[in-house]
Amino acid sequence: MKQTFRFIKPIERITHLKPNATMMLFLASVLAVIMANSSLSTIYHEILEYPINLTIGGHEVFSHHGETMTLLQFVNDVLMVIFFLAVGLEIKQEILVGELSSFKKAMLPIVGAIGGMIVPVLFFLLVVHEGPGARGAAIPMSTDIAFALAALAVLGSRVPASLKVFLTALAVADDIGGIIVIALFYSSHINIGMLAIAFGILFIMYLMGRMHVSNLGLYFVCTFFVWLFFLQSGIHTTIAGVLAAFMIPARPGLHAKNLRAEMRSLFEAMPNDKIRQSGSSLILSHNQINVINSMRKIARKAISPMQLMEEYLSPIVGYFVLPLFAFANAGITLGGVTADALWGVPMAVFLGLFVGKPLGIYFFTYGFVKMRLCPWPEGMSRLNLMAVSLFGGIGFTVSLFIATLSYAGAEHLLFLNEAKLGIFVASIFAAVVGIVTLRYELNLENAKAQKS
């Protein structure tokens, strides 16, 4: 049987995500809401205020503006760097071999993402255009790729592959826009010296890649120091994760085409030493173990540091970082939101995500196709596009993150609480209406196919 070796495109990997990670994210969010609105609320807030400290040589590593980080700050300023490191690796893969690897492929998802960022901001500002509440205008810009794909997966194998590809590429382009917004608008009091040191370490990482250094431990250590100096520089630390990801080399030590030949030669060199066996127990000879270890090293060399790091980070992000982030940030206090306040930030976020986001994605995409600037995506109808645009309105993770940046500090706590409410309601509406719309379209197509 003929076999071929190739990169597993990130689009394929992301669209086959295990649902368990998304379920953990959902359950962590529900737990946070329950605790924040019950007799456990005091315990919940005490957990978030728990100090996290690590002292090395008299220096507090996890300190924020000279103060020891709380668990909430640790999650948002440290653990989310790991999330954005993983996001950066996915973006790099998309640019290299995925749906953003050529101008023709990338144009439509990027156009859709731009529309999905501009229009939600306009809808937000129509409702809240002045005062401290307007600081959250960027909140409805983001799409939560995990929840969006989970909503798409509800309809099973009937969903055309082109829809999954377009939605994933759209979300990746959306992430790029979100990262730029964080870098430009959520950084203050920039320390040029610290920033210069951070970029110096990034340059060292780049040189390591050029010199074919494949030791992941070295890249993780460098990333830690890049984060540390970004923390002191005034630029938000999540940008450190993205920039570090771009420095991780995508070139493997052994080309995949040569892997089979290397493995065959090692397999042929396997000594015919007697294998000692007792029941289900097997004892290999030292020579056999040496050959098997050589096979392991050769196989590892065939995977680039970029993909290897992404494989390591994926379960950590999915099963630890994002659920903990959701638990720390999703605890909206429903009793603190008044009926009058619903027409402020909550409505602005809701309209931005549920109305502005889908309309922006749909009309920018459809407009470019009608102007013949881009070809229509294969296998996608106008109703399909509207459904995918609705899934783009599922904000959640990154929207919550931008909300915490927009309304930082005790004086903005009420706005933060209101923004969370808007994110929750809009994401649920977008998911439900998107599923209903796509199900209707798929049933319509199925009925037409049966008639013909």
Curated annotation (Swiss-Prot):
Keyword Phosphoprotein listed: no
GO molecular function: sodium:proton antiporter activity
Transmembrane domains' residue ranges: 23-43, 71-91, 108-128, 136-156, 165-185, 189-209, 216-236, 316-336, 349-369, 385-405, 418-438
Domain of life of the source: Bacteria
Keywords: Antiport, Cell inner membrane, Cell membrane, Ion transport, Membrane, Sodium, Sodium transport, Transmembrane, Transmembrane helix, Transport
Record's bilayer topology term: Multi-pass membrane protein
GO biological process: regulation of pH
Catalytic activity: Na(+)(in) + 2 H(+)(out) = Na(+)(out) + 2 H(+)(in)
Major localization listed first in the record, in broad terms: membrane
UniProt subcellular location: Cell inner membrane
Gene Ontology CC annotation, any one: plasma membrane
PANTHER family membership: NA(+)_H(+) ANTIPORTER NHAA, SODIUM ION/PROTON ANTIPORTER NHAA-RELATED
HAMAP family: NhaA
NCBIfam families found in the cross-reference section: NhaA
Name under which the protein is recorded: Na(+)/H(+) antiporter NhaA
Native source organism of the sequence: Porphyromonas gingivalis (strain ATCC 33277 / DSM 20709 / CIP 103683 / JCM 12257 / NCTC 11834 / 2561)
Origin organism lineage: Bacteria, Pseudomonadati, Bacteroidota, Bacteroidia, Bacteroidales
